């Protein structure tokens, strides 16, 4: 058999961290309402790349497609059912065009991304965005989720088909294949004692307001999530100041693949893709059993909100910089 590579574009990801002017400062808000008068713009970029690796049998017939899109499949976010989300539509539409091929989805760096355009949906979802931002319960937003998945699936399918028309003429039967797996460690994001003490006081206040023998509601538990995170981080940083996790890198032909265990913000991926020796780089997030959480940029930490605070991040921007340098070095060593 053989393989072939292709790079295309599909508009799937949108930044999910709009920024607002609050008391003269820029503040970020995960899933904020962009129709508010103090909306300033987005905290960071989006990546509309679509990276593909196609597999072929000995008769040069297509057998599968690995598709890397830097966006989580979360159209159905905050609903209590299992779904393949837009990837189900990608598989259906691709198989209608290319036959019963195997489709392997990969999520590129997308910690600050989501598949919905907040500028477009904010006007009709003002109440829903408040619930969505709180992440405390299910929320039915004012748009057709199935239709969104079908449209996203169509855009990805178009990119895969465009790439296939090029790739089928560039099949490699003996590509260079090299691989490496190693343990990487980067600085653990630490917290200050004053913040831990304040978090502990807030938790005790919630406990005091709860009837004896009673249970916290789901919303109350979620509101304690951030403060519990401060306590847990303080305990962890007494034991270590490094976060360790497995990294897998491999080369197939002119492409490099690198994993990480984070919801990695797009800017880090851009740096790795631009600076590595590989002509094409697949930066694959959330791809080990290590629980890395989000890995925000300094701009995100300064902006605040979920996805940039200690409770949802094991590593901060300093660790992100180190991840970039070490990952580039590991990929380049394969060339």
Residue ranges and their predicted role:
Residues 1-335:
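Non-catalytic substrate/cofactor recognition surfaces at enzyme active-site rims
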